[in-house]
Amino acid sequence: MAVLPAMQLNTAERFFLSVKRSATGRAWRGRLDERGQARALAIAQRNSLPELLARVLAGLGVEPDGALAFLDPSIRNLMPDPHGITDMEAASKRIADGIMRGESVVIFGDYDVDGVTASTLLCRYLRHCGLDPIVHIPDRIFEGYGPNVDAIRSFAERGMTLLVTVDCGTTSLEALAEAKQLGLETVVIDHHQADEELPPVKAIVNPNRADDLSGLSHLAAVGLVFLTLVAISRELRQRNFWTGMRPEPDLLSLLHLVALGTVADVVPLKGLNRAFVAKGLIALRRREHVGATALMDVARLAGPPQPWHLGHLLGPRINAGGRIGRADLGVRLLLEEDASEAARIAVELDRLNRERQQIELATVAQAEAEAMAALGLEEKGGVVVTAGPGWHPGVVGLVAARLKERYGRPAFAIALEPGGTGMGSGRSIVGVDIGQAVRRAVHEGLLLKGGGHAMAAGVTLRKDALSAFRAYLEDALGPAIEAARRERALSIDGAVSGGAVNPTLVEMLARAGPYGAGNPEPVFALPAHTLAYADLIGGEHVRARFESGDGKFVTAIAFRAASQPLGKALFENRHRTMHAAGCFTLDRWQGKERVQMRLIDVAPA
């Protein structure tokens, strides 16, 4: 197996394969410096691990003494005491009271995958305890994000006595004050950034509130719900609630929901999050959960589910219901126990996802044209802010993500409405906190509403405030963006030849997974391979084949690259010698295994 030796790097700048500017405009750098290479050697020697796996572990920041534990993440070993989170005791006791009394409970979730899976997880638990909770997922367009006064009043009219908000509620002052006024006690389980003033509720379980010292701010809402259920189970155990007829539920059997929400919300896959996903993937592979299995089947997964499948195939289909269809479809699917009904819902979500893709493509084309005109050929400026009439509010977050990837800087896409207001979403790059900037813009009167976290935010504004908001972002984020873009390089873990790329290699690398945000998938280079062909597939993807000098080849696919610099470089350099960089995946189809490279970048050799 060929691994590029350190001496082939430019040691002063660590340019990998001497690539200073690639097709995507980035330098390639070796992930490991001299200290990192020494750590990799120590990992390999002390733990009897293959050199390449040791290099990957060192690149992830793993120390020699912790390598074996890292390769086998254990929830038992990583699980914190839930009561270390502020208000967890009050929250678990109040929900336990509701279970003991048989109260009427309503779960108010968010319409994204994290909110849907968190709502489903809590609902399944309460059903096991004998309750029949209502799950309310708000309509993105007509209700917007988080609890609203009209919904609260309808819950009170229906006799609900306990409201649990998941993945929302921290900043819902007016709506939750109304809930208190109407006698509806509320528990908030959320992970979004908190303001100084908190709503008047029974408990707010949120590691991102200022007075929380748990250090668990990296958890998704579904992970927080899981910890809350651990605390509730403990509380009910102390009250002798569990019996032979009503045994304590096996929370580990529900980790498929935690894995799906954690990956889809792009929280760091480190520590407990990584263990959640590792064990949740095992649960998904067993195909024991009717709704999740129907979703995997309609998404046509080629092989056992991996984090990439959750984030790019399963998550978008759940999201499609909340974006352009019925917001409750995702929860209905994940709660469904009848296989035929689950299949019907999954097919409907798949149809909505295809419709969403068409809407997204059309909107992206308009947004890119506007961004290109604003930035100019030299792409000057810090933040990309685009807006358009008629844009579907359900896809603006996806459009912002596309713009962020295309231009390598924070991006906002805003759907302008006939009434003179706009609803939009922003996505950021590492090192630039747009959530904080948006909250400050609300306080300064530039936005009607807004919130989020470092990497994603939502905004509502008046159309006539658009220019002022754009100028504010340039001023507030400009220095951070400039610093982040200076560090914009592609980190390479090593180089392999086409002949060394096989299923054994991929399975070995998988031991350091699951990969995702905060635990990046290793990137390898194919040095000086001939680009045998590059073809358009699926309208926007590029499939390529790279051949080594000894005639061995690797098939690669560059997703959504056809109209991007990467796709253009592939089409223009057929039959030339290129360096290629990407991640290796194992594709299982019709009983056969083959390795495919998910192409990230290329450069002339």
Residue ranges and their predicted role:
Residues 166-180:
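Active-site core of PLP-dependent enzymes with the aminotransferase class I/II
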Residues 189-200, 446:
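Short, glycine/polar-rich helix-capping loops at beta-to-alpha or helix-loop-helix junctions
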Residues 4-5, 21, 97-103, 341-347, ...:
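Mid-to-C-terminal polyanion-binding domains and interfaces
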Residues 121, 199-243, 254-263:
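Short alpha-helices
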